C-alpha cells in the first residue's frame, strides 16, 4: 500500500509543479516594479507507454514543456534511442515513439531534454534527464531468459561485491504495486554468494581466492509474488574469479603539443599521446574521447591495441589559412574497471592537446575543375570564349599565370592567354571536330618573376555547334543500269543523300532533276530517298550506251544548300525476264562538290605562282649578271693604243658601249643594218694559210655570238692573238705594222664600221672618210 501511495504522489508531482510555476509566473507578471529574475523550470508529464500498441505509428508518449517565454525556443532530446525510437517536435515538445516497444527487451529509456534558441543554438536552460517507462500486464510466471548465466568477480573482493545479475522475465511490472514481483533464491552455493530480489548476485565472503577455486556453479530459483513457478524457473550461474583491474589510465603529461603541415593526408598521423596503466596488459583497454573544444569532425583519436597509445589523425584536409591552431582537451578512461574498485583521483584523466598547423606552399586552386564553352562554327566574330580563374590559397596571394599543358589532337585550335582567357585564333569547323579538349595549368608568379614549380590543372571543353555549311551529297549503292526494253515506270535505282552537317529531327532532303527532257523521272520517297524510274522507255544501245542524269539535292537548312550530282546510267541488253545479259561497266561519276573545286583551283593557282616565282628569280639572276658584265664593259670602254713616240690624243679613242649593245636587241639579230654601219664585207680569198685561218676563226666566233641568245653584245667580239706557225702578221704591235712587207690587204677593215676604226687606221691603206665616227 505504501508503494502505491508513493507512485501516485510521483505521478501527481509534475502537475503540482506546473501549478506552482503558473502561480510564480502570475506573481512575476503582476509585479512590474520588481527586477528580480525568477528561475525557470522544466515542466512535463511523467511519461509512460504501453508495449505493443496496435494503433498506427507514431505513438504519443508525452510532452516536454518549459516556462521559458521565448518564441524562438526549440526542444531537442538525446540519450537512449533519442531521434531513432523517440523523437520530439522541436517547437511544441511533443514526444512520439516511432517503433512498437517491447518491455521484455527494454523496460525503460533514460533521455535528456534540452531547450535552445534555434537562431544561435544557445542553451536557454540547463539540460534535464527524464525516463520513459514501458508498462505491461501481469499474466505470466517468471521465466529465466537463459538456462545458464555466467559471471565473474575480481578476486579478494569485499563482502557484498556484485558479481552478476540473473533475469527472469515476467509480464508483470515489478515496480508497480499490485503486480507480480519476481524474487530469487539460491538453492545451491548460498554459502559463497547471495542474491537479492532484483536478481543481483553478490559475494557472501570476502576471502574468495581465484588461486584456490577459479569458478563456482550455483543454482538460482525464481518465483513471483503469488509463488507461481514453472518448469523453467531455475537457472545455473557459473561464476569465475578474475584478476583485479583496479587502476585507470593516466596521461604522462598534462598537455601535448604537435606541429603538422597543412598538406598532411587524411588519416595520417598527427601525433601520439601516452598513458600509464599499472594493470596487466589484458586489463588495458583505454578509450579516448573529446571533452572540451569539440573537433571530432576534424580529428579522431584511435587507441593502439598493443601500446595503449592514443593516435590522433585528421578526418578531413587541414587549411592553414582557415585555422592555424587547434586546442582541445581529451580524456582517457577504462570502461572495464569495476566501479567497486574506484580509487581516489577518479576514473578520468584529462590532457590538453595543441596542434599547430604550418603553412605549405600550395598550388593555385581553380574555381571549377572543368570548364565548358560553346561556340558556333565558322563564326569569324568570336575570338574570345571566356576565361578560367584560379587563386592562390596561401596567405601570400600571389598572381596566377595560366598556360596550356595538354590538348586533344585537335586542341591546337584553342589557345590560353597568360591571364586565363580562352581564345580562338581562327573560326572552328564542326565537321573537322565537334569537340576540343585542352588542359589548362595555373602557376603562381613568385616575387622574383619566376614561376612556381607547383601547378594545378583544370579541363576546358569547347563544344562547336553546327551551322548549315555543307551541301548534301548523293549516295547510291551500285552502278545504275537500265534494260533497252525497260517499260515506263520501271525503277532503276533508289538514291539517298548524306550531309556532313547535323541533321535535325525535322530535317529532310529534296531531290529534283535539272531537266525534264530526259528519258528518266524522279520520285521522292517518305524515307528521305528518291527513285529514278524510266519515263518513256525504248532505249537504243546503238544510239547511246550511257546516259548522264544530273540530280539536284537540297536540304532544308538555314541557309538552304544544294549540290548537283550526275548519275551515269548504262543501257544494257536484257533477256525476256529482264535480267542483264550484256552491259559495259562504267565508273561511277558524280558531281564535284564546291569544296573539291576550291581545292583544285587552289592547287592550280599554287602551281602557277611557283612557276611565276621561278621565272622572276631567273630574270633577276640574269639582271645581276648583266650588271656585273656592264662593269667589265665599262672598264674596257676605251681602246688604248701605245706606240714608242706616244700617240697623243690618238692613244685613247672612246666608243659608246650602247652602240655595241644595240647590235642585237632582245636577243634577235636585226635583219636591216642601220645606215651608220657598213655591212661587213668578207675579204677576198687569199691563198695564205695564216690569214685564212684567222679570218675563218673570227667569222665563226662572230656567228656564234650573233646566234647565242643568252649572251649580251659586249661578250660577242674579242681580240684574238693568233700565234699559229703560218701567221704572216705575227703581231699586232705598231712596232712592226709600219715596216711590214706583207702583201695582205687589210682594207676590208674599213668596211667593218666604226668599231674597227683603230684597226683600219693601223693596217688599212686608206681610211674610209665616209664613215660617221
From Swiss-Prot:
Keywords: Calcium, Cell adhesion, Cell junction, Cell membrane, Cleavage on pair of basic residues, Cytoplasm, Glycoprotein, Membrane, Metal-binding, Repeat, Signal, Transmembrane, Transmembrane helix. SUPFAM superfamilies: Cadherin-like. Residues 41-595 are extracellular. Ca(2+) 2 binds at residues 51, 104, 136-137, 139, 172. It is a single-pass type I membrane protein. The keyword tRNA-binding does not apply. One of its GO terms (biological process) is endothelial cell morphogenesis. Glycans are attached at residues 27, 31-32, 121, 150, 263, 437, 519, 531. Its main location: other. It is found in: Cell junction, Adherens junction; Cell membrane; Cytoplasm. Ca(2+) 3 binds at residues 138, 140, 170, 172, 179, 224. N-glycosylated. O-glycosylated. Residues 618-773 are cytoplasmic. One of its GO terms (cellular component) is bicellular tight junction. The chain crosses the membrane at residues 596-617. Pfam families: CADH_Y-type_LIR (PF01049), Cadherin (PF00028). Residues 39-144, 145-251, 252-366, 367-474, 474-582 form the Cadherin domain. Ca(2+) 1 binds at residues 51-52, 102, 104, 139. Residues 19-40 form a propeptide. Residues 1-18 form the signal peptide. PANTHER family: CADHERIN-23, CADHERIN-5. Three calcium ions are usually bound at the interface of each cadherin domain and rigidify the connections, imparting a strong curvature to the full-length ectodomain. This is Cadherin-5. The gene is CDH5.
Amino acid at each position: 500500500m505504501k508503494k502505491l501511495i508513493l507512485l501516485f504522489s510521483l505521478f501527481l508531482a509534475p502537475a503540482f509543479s506546473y501549478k506552482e510555476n503558473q502561480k510564480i509566473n502570475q506573481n512575476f507578471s503582476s509585479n512590474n516594479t520588481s527586477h528580480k529574475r525568477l528561475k525557470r523550470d522544466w515542466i512535463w508529464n511523467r511519461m509512460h507507454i504501453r508495449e505493443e500498441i496496435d494503433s498506427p505509428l507514431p505513438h504519443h508518449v508525452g510532452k516536454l514543456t518549459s516556462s521559458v517565454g521565448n518564441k524562438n525556443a526549440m526542444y531537442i532530446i538525446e540519450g537512449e534511442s533519442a531521434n531513432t525510437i523517440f523523437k520530439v517536435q522541436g517547437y511544441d515538445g511533443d514526444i512520439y515513439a516511432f517503433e512498437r516497444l517491447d518491455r521484455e527487451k527494454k523496460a525503460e529509456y533514460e533521455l535528456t531534454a534540452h531547450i535552445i534558441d534555434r537562431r544561435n543554438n544557445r542553451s536557454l536552460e540547463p539540460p534535464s534527464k527524464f525516463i520513459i517507462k514501458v508498462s505491461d500486464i501481469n499474466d505470466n510466471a517468471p521465466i529465466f531468459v537463459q538456462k545458464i548465466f555466467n559471471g565473474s568477480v575480481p578476486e579478494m573482493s569485499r563482502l557484498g561485491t556484485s558479481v552478476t545479475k540473473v533475469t527472469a522475465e515476467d509480464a508483470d511490472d515489478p515496480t508497480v504495486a499490485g503486480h507480480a514481483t519476481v524474487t530469487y533464491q539460491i538453492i545451491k552455493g548460498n554459502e559463497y554468494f547471495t542474491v537479492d530480489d532484483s536478481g543481483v548476485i553478490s559475494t557472501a565472503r570476502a576471502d574468495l581466492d581465484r588461486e584456490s577455486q577459479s569458478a563456482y556453479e550455483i543454482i538460482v530459483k525464481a518465483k513471483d509474488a503469488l509463488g507461481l513457478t514453472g518448469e523453467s524457473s531455475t537457472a545455473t550461474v557459473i561464476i569465475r574469479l578474475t584478476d583485479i583491474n583496479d587502476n585507470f589510465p593516466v596521461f604522462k603529461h598534462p598537455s601535448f603539443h604537435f606541429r603538422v603541415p597543412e598538406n598532411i593526408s587524411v588519416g595520417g598521423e598527427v601525433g601520439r599521446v601516452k598513458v600509464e596503466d599499472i594493470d596487466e596488459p589484458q586489463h588495458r583497454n583505454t578509450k579516448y574521447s573529446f571533452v572540451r573544444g569539440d573537433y571530432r569532425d576534424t580529428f579522431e583519436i584511435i587507441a593502439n591495441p598493443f601500446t595503449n597509445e592514443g593516435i590522433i589523425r585528421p578526418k578531413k584536409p587541414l587549411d592553414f589559412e582557415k585555422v592555424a591552431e587547434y586546442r582541445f582537451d581529451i580524456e582517457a578512461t577504462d570502461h572495464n574497471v569495476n566501479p567497486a574498485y574506484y580509487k581516489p583521483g577518479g576514473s578520468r584523466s584529462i590532457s590538453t592537446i595543441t596542434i599547430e598547423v604550418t603553412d605549405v606552399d600550395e598550388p593555385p586552386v581553380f574555381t571549377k575543375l572543368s570548364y565548358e564553352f560553346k561556340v558556333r562554327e565558322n563564326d569569324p566574330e568570336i575570338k574570345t570564349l571566356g576565361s578560367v580563374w584560379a587563386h592562390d590559397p596561401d596567405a601570400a596571394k600571389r598572381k596566377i599565370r595560366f598556360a596550356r599543358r595538354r590538348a586533344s589532337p585537335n586542341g591546337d585550335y584553342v589557345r590560353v592567354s597568360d591571364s586565363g582567357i580562352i581564345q580562338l585564333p581562327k573560326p572552328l569547323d564542326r565537321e573537322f571536330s565537334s569537340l576540343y579538349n585542352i588542359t589548362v595549368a595555373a602557376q603562381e608568379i613568385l616575387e622574383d618573376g619566376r614561376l612556381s614549380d607547383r601547378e594545378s590543372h583544370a579541363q576546358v571543353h569547347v563544344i562547336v555547334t553546327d551551322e548549315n555549311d555543307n551541301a548534301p551529297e548523293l549516295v547510291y549503292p551500285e552502278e545504275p543500269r537500265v534494260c533497252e526494253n525497260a517499260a515506263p515506270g520501271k525503277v532503276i535505282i533508289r538514291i539517298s543523300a548524306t550531309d556532313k552537317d547535323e541533321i535535325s529531327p525535322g530535317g529532310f532532303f529534296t531531290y529534283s532533276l535539272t531537266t525534264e527532257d530526259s528519258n528518266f523521272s524522279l520520285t521522292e520517297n517518305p524515307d528521305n530517298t528518291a527513285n529514278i524510274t524510266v519515263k518513256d522507255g525504248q532505249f537504243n544501245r546503238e544510239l547511246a550506251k550511257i546516259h548522264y542524269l544530273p540530280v539536284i539535292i537540297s536540304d532544308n537548312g538555314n541557309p538552304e544548300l544544294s549540290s548537283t550530282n550526275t548519275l551515269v546510267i548504262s543501257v544494257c541488253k536484257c533477256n525476256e525476264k529482264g535480267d542483264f545479259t550484256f552491259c559495259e561497266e562504267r565508273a561511277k561519276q558524280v558531281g564535284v562538290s564546291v569544296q573539291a573545286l576550291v581545292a583544285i583551283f587552289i592547287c592550280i593557282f599554287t602551281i602557277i605562282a611557283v612557276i611565276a616565282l621561278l621565272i622572276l628569280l631567273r630574270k633577276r639572276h640574269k639582271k645581276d649578271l648583266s650588271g656585273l658584265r656592264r662593269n667589265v664593259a665599262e672598264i674596257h670602254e676605251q681602246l688604248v693604243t701605245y706606240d714608242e713616240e706616244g700617240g697623243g690624243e690618238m692613244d685613247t679613242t672612246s666608243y659608246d658601249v650602247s652602240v655595241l649593245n644595240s647590235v642585237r636587241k632582245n636577243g634577235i639579230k636585226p635583219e636591216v643594218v642601220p645606215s651608220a654601219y657598213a655591212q661587213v664585207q668578207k675579204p677576198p680569198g687569199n691563198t695564205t694559210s695564216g690569214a685564212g685561218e684567222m679570218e675563218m676563226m673570227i667569222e665563226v666566233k662572230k656567228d656564234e655570238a650573233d646566234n647565242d641568245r643568252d649572251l649580251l653584245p659586249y661578250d660577242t667580239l674579242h681580240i684574238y692573238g693568233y700565234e699559229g706557225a703560218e701567221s704572216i702578221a705575227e703581231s699586232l704591235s705598231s712596232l712592226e705594222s709600219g715596216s711590214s712587207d706583207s702583201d695582205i690587204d687589210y682594207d676590208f677593215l674599213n668596211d667593218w664600221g666604226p668599231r674597227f676604226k683603230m684597226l683600219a687606221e693601223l693596217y688599212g691603206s686608206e681610211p674610209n672618210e665616209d664613215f660617221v665616227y
